[in-house]
Amino acid sequence: MSENNSIAPQYEVVVIGAGIGGICAGVKLQEIGIDDFLIVDRVGGLGGTWYSHSYPDAGCDIPSTTYQFSFARKPDWDRLFAKRDQILEYLREVAADHDLPRRMRFHTTIVREEWDDRDALWRLHVDSGEVITARFVISAVGAYINAKTTPDIPGLACYAGVSMHPAAWNHDYDFTGKRVAIIGVGASTMQIAPKLAGQVERLDIYQRTPQVYLPKPDFVLRPWMQRMLALPGGSAIVNGLAQGVIDSALRVAVFTPAPLWRLGARLVDALGRSAYAGWVRIKVQNKEIRKQLRPDFGIVCIRGGAGGDYLPTLNRDNVELITAGIGEITPHSIRSADGVEREIDALVLATGYEVFSDPESYKPGTVLGRDGFDLGVFYNTEELKAYYSTSVAGVPNRFIMIGPYSWTGTAFHYFVENAMRHIATVIEETRRRGATVVEVRPQAQERFHQEMLRSGRNLSYYLETRCAGSNSYFINSQGKSPYLRPWSLLKTYRKATRFDREDYSYRGPARRDDPVDAPDIELAAAELS
């Protein structure tokens, strides 16, 4: 206990989440000399999405050559689009190479995070009743935070058959000869449906909004290809080319004058829909099904998936695409809105996720910062904002790896590495100054937010106006699109560490008989208005 009677935390850093973000956090913390950290996860092993999602044919719809850390290149992927088991094996290897497993705890669900300003630490309340204390907290819970396992469908609670979500697949259930319904037509269904169709008696697929299913040029990576990727810089060059394509598209979106952008958006949407209709015509035989598959919005409004087998699956006699909507679920059937009732033995709820750009992902009462600041209340009443997508005023010593306006690059790894470079720089600066508390200044947070709005005007127009009605997760319930970072990849990379250190305030723990000297959030907001 120090002279101001503050207590020492159990850990310098606790990382919440042991997926791609948590592994990256552990590696980068060691690089700045921090070994006193703990990584916790609510499930039974590391890997995040790739641990939880073990449904049939689960795999990546991004080329494997780009789906990896820059500090752990893997040249020997089995195929261009890796399957779940090899991705999970890769993550385990990276974690083991950096001695992370001994710093991990599983089956540990944090239900509430409370900041103690007097002791300058976080108290993390576990569902078991345990309390873990940490100087710093890094939230690495991923982009797809909570599976929507109980969608608002009439009668769902009364269903008496077998049901499951792609994030919690029941491997003990034998689908052979069964009547199965899948609700939802996103990326999971794109992979699940072709596998189930060959087993089941009948497969009903319920579609609310048409999705986009792109060609998937998958193939086995031959030994000579793997040798090429293993050459010095081989994987980096291939990844750089892919990043260049993404970067070019971002630059066009950000720098095109608004009138030209709006004209171009209409043209691109029309051409895209026409090209996609041609692709569907090649793959799907039935004219009525083709009509049901064609979106009436631009094909880039939603995150299309690379799923070469899904469209041909709709040609099977035992597969039916149902677009009438769901009227009611009974104990043993689904009645569609047109009155047709179809009996089922099993139900797959591929109904999506709460994502990081949804205010609903941040539950009130779960993250309580300085002076009672409630992150959930803030994000559910204000626009989502965070300085460099990682730091929120009123929440000292806590960082978000996947926050508002964070998504950039070809894959998840790119932007979590950049987020962690920023976080590590802030923690390192705090320790260098001999401080124990760091908090972003409200003025800096608002300045960054306004830059996101200004730089992202073209993207916002497209997503929030032209994509209305697409049910895209790029657009949240507030009608905003705080998903993509409207910067070039180079700017994102450079700015991660090249920022004004005075955008943060630094101090020690408050003395027990002194008032806390911290930024005034409301005053700063008023000054900026």
Residue map of PLM features:
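Rossmann-like dinucleotide-binding core of oxidoreductases
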Residues: 3-10, 14-20, 24-45, 139-278, ...
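Core beta-strand elements of the Rossmann-like FAD/NAD(P) dinucleotide-binding domain
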Residues: 9-11, 127-136, 175-176, 337-346
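Beta1-alpha1 glycine-rich phosphate/pyrophosphate-binding loop at the start
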Residues: 11-104, 207-208, 282-286
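Short beta-strand to alpha-helix junction loop
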Residues: 74-93, 264-270, 297-309
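A conserved short coil-to-beta-strand element within the FAD-binding core of flavoproteins
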Residues: 106-121, 319-337
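Glycine/threonine-rich phosphate-binding loop and adjacent beta-strand/alpha-helix elements that clamp
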Residues: 346, 350-430
